[in-house]
Structure formats: C-alpha cells, structure tokens
C-alpha cells in the first residue's frame, strides 16, 4: 500500500471511530435521562400484565394516575406530602417534598417523576397536575372572546348551538335519512 492510501485509510478509520464513540456517548447520556412512563396498575402488575416487565426498585420512572380521595397526608412542619395514586386498578404511594402545583387536589390527574423506592412506593422529585382538555387560562379565554367578537363569531357559534349550526345539523340528518330509505 502506498503512503497516500495509508494516510487516507487512517483518516477514514479515525472518522468512523470518532463517530462511533460520539454515538455511544450520546446513547449513554440519553439512557441516563430516560424515565419510562407507567400507570399504577403497570407498576403493580407489569406492562401488559407481564410480571417480567415491572419496574425495578431504584429505577427512575414517571407515573400517571389520579390522586385517591382522602389519601393526601401532609406533614405540618415540612413540605412533605404523601398520597395514593391509582388508575383503574391498584394504587401506589407517592412521597414528595416540595410545593405542589396549584391544580393538585384529590380526584385530579397527576404525573409524578422520581425513583421507585419500594415495589409500590415512589419518591417523587417532581409532581405535575394534569387538567382536562377544556381548560383554558382566563386571560387567553378573554383574548379569544375579544377576537371572535370582532370577527362576528358568537358564543353559540363556538359551542355549536347557533341557529346556523342547528339548521346544518337538520339538513345533514335529512340527507342521511334520505340515503337510508
């Protein structure tokens, strides 16, 4: 092999090696920050009811569920809170020390991120309160009403209950009934 080919080969091998090392380090860093999402039922029973797919104690996970009514226990001297979270099945205990979100309350959906310290106990580092899809901050709602009013769109139009909407529904129903006969 002539010296020119050797130098090219060294450059190509060095580039491939560098890309492989960079990809490996990137994947390692990402794996350290991946928090798998589970429901309380999946923590207790395993994903797809497979006991081999339960999260391990010490694993960082995210849990989504509903706060069980009457389960919130607060420490009077600190910001420590403990509550039960469930979905349609068994519940798990979530420990959290910090200020809870304003929307946090019993019966409300939450997502907690933390470390599983026992098979059904999570020490959360972050608790997020979920709200339904109809929630809208008041400021945004007021702004939209202003814009819709200026465009000639009424509240009834937004809700689908205006006379125009009702007439359209009736026409559609008549058309469907005519096709069925």
From Swiss-Prot:
Membrane association type: Single-pass type II membrane protein
Transmembrane segments annotated in the record for this chain: 9-29
Residue numbers on the Periplasmic membrane side: 30-181
Basic and acidic residues bias spans: 135-148, 156-166
Pfam families reported in the protein's UniProt record: CcmE
Renumbered residue ranges of the record's region Disordered: 135-166
InterPro entries found in the cross-reference section: CcmE, CcmE-like_sf, NA-bd_OB-fold
Recorded GO MF terms: heme binding; metal ion binding
SUPFAM superfamilies tied to this protein: Heme chaperone CcmE (SSF82093)
Single biological process term from Gene Ontology: cytochrome complex assembly
Binding site for heme: 131, 135
Keyword ATP-binding: no
GO cellular component: plasma membrane
Keywords annotated in UniProt: Cell inner membrane, Cell membrane, Cytochrome c-type biogenesis, Heme, Iron, Membrane, Metal-binding, Signal-anchor, Transmembrane, Transmembrane helix
Cytoplasmic compartment segments: 1-8
Cellular compartments annotated: Cell inner membrane
NCBIfam families assigned to the protein according to its UniProt record, in alphabetical order: PRK13165.1, PRK13254.1-1, PRK13254.1-3
Role noted for this protein: Heme chaperone required for the biogenesis of c-type cytochromes. Transiently binds heme delivered by CcmC and transfers the heme to apo-cytochromes in a process facilitated by CcmF and CcmH.
Family: Belongs to the CcmE/CycJ family.
Name of the featured protein: Cytochrome c-type biogenesis protein CcmE
